[in-house]
Curated annotation (Swiss-Prot):
Coiled coil spans: none
Organism name: Guillardia theta
Name the UniProt record assigns to this protein: Photosystem II stability/assembly factor HCF136, chloroplastic
Keywords annotated in UniProt: Chloroplast, Photosynthesis, Photosystem II, Plastid, Thylakoid, Transit peptide
Record family assignment: Belongs to the Ycf48 family.
Cysteine-cysteine disulfides: none
GO aspect biological process, one term: photosynthesis
Recorded name of the encoding gene: hcf136
Free-text function comment from the UniProt entry: Essential for photosystem II (PSII) biogenesis; required for assembly of an early intermediate in PSII assembly that includes D2 (psbD) and cytochrome b559.
Amino acid sequence: MFINSFCLKNLLPVFSKNKTFLLNVKCLSNNKFENHSNFFKINRTKFINYLLYPTLTSLYPKFTHANTTSWTKVDLPVDSVLFDIEFTDPECKHGWLVGSKGTFLETDDGGNTWVPRTFANLDPDEELTYRFENISFEGQEGWVIGKPAIILYTKDGGKTWFRVPVSPKLPGEPCLIKALGSESAELTTTSGAIYVTNNAGRNWKAQVKETIDSTLNRTISSGVSGASYFTGNVINVIRNSEGKYLAISSRGNFYLTWEPGQDFWIPRARETSRRIQSMGFIQNDNQKGIWMSTRGGGLSVSTKNFDFESISSFNFENIDIKTGGYGILDAAFVNDKDIWIICGGGIVYNSTDKGKNWTKVDGIDKLSGNLYKIKFVNNNKGFILGSNGLLLRYQ
């Protein structure tokens, strides 16, 4: 049953910089954190990695693009899968990086160096079971979600975090959260439930009347190919700056859209025989269009000014790019001309003319690790996240 709202009481403190912990790590690096002794304990594995990684800095290569831009491998004290990165200030100096095995890293120099952070009231072995997948900030207010189901909230840029209890009646698992400021956030689950809180997670109000599964049961005769194979979950949920959403069915058979004010998600048929692999808003703007990647390396973009209220499928135009059959996992449309894509096999391509011509970035595919996510925090600074603690920085 889909619930319209739920109440969460007693936010639990997770960790705070105002406590004194077991280890002073100030002497271990040259980063700009001035008072490491006020931070929290570091488990054995993270501590050993943190001791070793400065000695390897000189071994990390730089990959140069024809336009004198470059991607540089950032040394990290972890070997986990990295899922998301976010900064708390307009200058993009102070930020957080999250991933599997309880990975929670902090930077104060724009992403050049990262320091591991550990929750003070969680056992180190327990923390390693968490997989932090998404982080979002609006000013100094931030939110983190992960699996097993967990929601964290901060109102001071990450100095102190609180754990928000997750209702056992929540349809699906949290998969995306967007900080809105003033103790507000929007939470989406793998079942298509969307909730908004205006009091730091104590209460949540549903924005849709039913889950995607229920919607498809009503519209199964609508002609949406693949809807009958829906497993009940969606992947790759994307929200743009206007609060509009895209979501892909777990099999990639079709996609769905939602915008504020609608009672349910609208399923839409794909226009190709290949399954959808990934989607996103171009420059995070609904008016710019949508991009879609399909299995085997297909890439297309929609026409502009499409109607989210219409039940018709959107029109897409193919972009000619030869990836050698490698699937396109993510894309970043930095501006009207500059496009970056990451593919299977650790391959990165760049176009500076709206996708007419593409250049492969040499050397990145030689690194140990797969690439999963590319994110530009502004027009001049971007990051690529991958497995084995692989983080690439562009500036």
